[in-house]
């Protein structure tokens, strides 16, 4: 059983460039676009997408940070959770929103994010951008923008490491049994 590096820093940058290009092409009115990163790793990805869009397409979209702590359906497991604050640049009514996250797996995080968004207005449209889509959905949720679709077994773990949160850049595919043994 092993840990495999799926993407390195350069490859992650290329995935982000492709995502930024696709988002900018679909949103010609960048002044109405709001990129909302889902805490934790969706936030630095949203800022990176903003910077890439600004560099390649002129006007930078606004960025927000969404905390979904109290909207998750697994609040009872894992002990007490401390919420962060959501920080959104404006009322989302009539805006084009792109939710940004690192990994899409079962769809529970995105479901919670959609529920949390209801407290900030009624966007014209909400789309989803993820760095990695690993499949195995429990909800009918699909990304509109996907950096890479990675085939995994349900028991495997995909970990995205970003310099802003982890001090390094890489995407790892980890065997779950190996991860469990390292926790004992």
Curated annotation (Swiss-Prot):
Pfam family, one: Pribosyltran
Keywords of the record: Glycosyltransferase, Transcription, Transcription regulation, Transferase
Origin: domain of life: Bacteria
GO MF annotation terms: uracil phosphoribosyltransferase activity
GO biological process, one term: regulation of DNA-templated transcription
Aminoacyl-tRNA synthetase found in the keyword field: no
InterPro entries with a match to the protein in the record: PRibTrfase_dom, PRTase-like, PyrR, PyrR_bifunctional
Annotated EC: 2.4.2.9
Chain span(s) of sequence motif PRPP-binding: 97-109
Reactions that this protein is recorded to catalyse: UMP + diphosphate = 5-phospho-alpha-D-ribose 1-diphosphate + uracil
Annotated family: Belongs to the purine/pyrimidine phosphoribosyltransferase family. PyrR subfamily.
Purpose of the protein: Regulates the transcription of the pyrimidine nucleotide (pyr) operon in response to exogenous pyrimidines.
Name the UniProt record assigns to this protein: Bifunctional protein PyrR
Naturally occurring in which organism (per UniProt): Synechococcus sp. (strain JA-3-3Ab)
């Amino acid at each position: 059983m092993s840990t495999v590096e799926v993407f390195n820093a350069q490859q992650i940058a290329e995935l982000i460039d492709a995502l930024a290009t696709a988002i900018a092409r679909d949103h010609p009115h960048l002044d109405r676009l709001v990129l909302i990163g889902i805490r934790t790793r969706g936030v630095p990805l949203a800022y990176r997408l903003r910077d890439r869009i600004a560099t390649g397409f002129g006007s930078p979209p606004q960025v927000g940070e969404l905390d979904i702590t109290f909207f998750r359906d697994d609040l009872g497991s894992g002990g007490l959770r401390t919420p962060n604050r959501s920080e959104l640049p404006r009322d989302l009514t009539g805006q084009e929103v792109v939710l940004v996250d690192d990994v899409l797996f079962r769809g529970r995080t995105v479901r919670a994010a959609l529920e949390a968004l209801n407290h900030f207005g009624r966007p014209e449209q909400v789309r989803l951008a993820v760095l990695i889509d690993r499949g195995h959905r429990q909800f009918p949720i699909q990304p509109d923008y996907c950096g890479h679709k990675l085939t995994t077994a349900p028991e495997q773990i995909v970990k995205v490491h970003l310099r802003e949160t982890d001090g390094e850049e890489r995407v790892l595919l980890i065997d779950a049994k190996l991860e469990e043994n390292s926790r004992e």
